[in-house]
Regions:
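Export/targeting segments at the very N-terminus of extracytoplasmic proteins
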Residues: 30-89
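Second-shell loop/turn segments in exported
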Residues: 34-43, 66-69, 91-96, 113-123, ...
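Catalytic and substrate-binding regions of cell-wall glycan-acting enzymes that process beta-1,4-linked
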Residues: 143, 148-187
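Substrate-binding/active-site groove segments that recognize
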Residues: 96-116, 129-135, 150, 154-157, ...
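A short secondary-structure junction motif
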Residues: 55-59, 109-113, 159, 185
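Proline-rich, low-complexity linker regions of envelope-associated factors in Gram-negative bacteria
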Residues: 1-42, 50
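Solvent-exposed, polar/charged alpha-helical surfaces in well-ordered, non-transmembrane soluble domains
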Residues: 50-57, 77-80, 128-135, 146, ...
Length: 187
């Protein structure tokens, strides 16, 4: 499985899957359930599915994605699983610690990515920002998807400090749930 770290063979075998459940449109609604989303973003935001597909296509070339050996479909499914875990596909999601949007980017990270403050107003920037940041974490950890996810959640310094997934309950859960969701989407 993805969680085992031996992702090459798994990705090759799962990519052939074409069950109806793997279609992005069946996995989440195309309209944000947040009643304020329409006022905040209008119809320019497009569906969440379209945002994820477009962002994954535009970031698939990044070194971290290539280092992880992810095909375009695998990258989309990983990004989709991350967004499910981070926000349950809610555009205006805000965490108690200040992370915002579909990909729950902290303001400081958004600043580093050059998307602050625009990501507060544009869901596409939320998704591409999260995709770029995840690709950076994958690059930092030589394509190791589990370490990249742990770094996305707990920060790269913690992954380096512990030599892998930190012993934080939230991060331990995070690196289990996203691969499970990824495998569901890819199947």
């Amino acid at each position: 499985t993805l969680a085992s770290g031996n992702s090459g063979a798994l990705f090759a075998s799962l990519e052939a899957g074409s069950t109806p459940e793997s279609a992005a449109g069946t996995l989440y609604g195309s309209v944000d359930p947040n009643p304020g989303a329409a006022q905040m973003f209008g119809d320019a935001s497009g569906s969440i599915e379209q945002l994820i597909i477009r962002a994954s296509q535009e970031t698939h070339h990044m070194y971290g994605v290539r280092a992880a050996g992810l095909s375009p479909k695998q990258w989309r499914c990983l990004l989709q699983a991350l967004i499910w875990q981070e926000s349950r596909f809610t555009i205006g999601a805000r965490s108690p610690v200040g992370a915002f949007g579909l990909t729950q980017i902290m303001p400081g990270t958004a600043q580093d990515l050059g998307i602050y403050p625009a990501y507060y107003e544009n869901p596409y920037i939320q998704v591409t920002g999260g995709a770029r940041y995840l690709a950076q974490m994958l690059a930092m950890f030589d394509g190791n998807v589990i370490h990249g996810l742990a770094a996305y959640n707990a920060g790269p310094g913690n992954v380096q400090r512990y030599g892998g997934v930190p012993p934080f309950a939230e991060t331990q859960h995070y690196v289990q749930v996203i691969p499970e969701r990824y495998n569901l989407y890819l199947a």
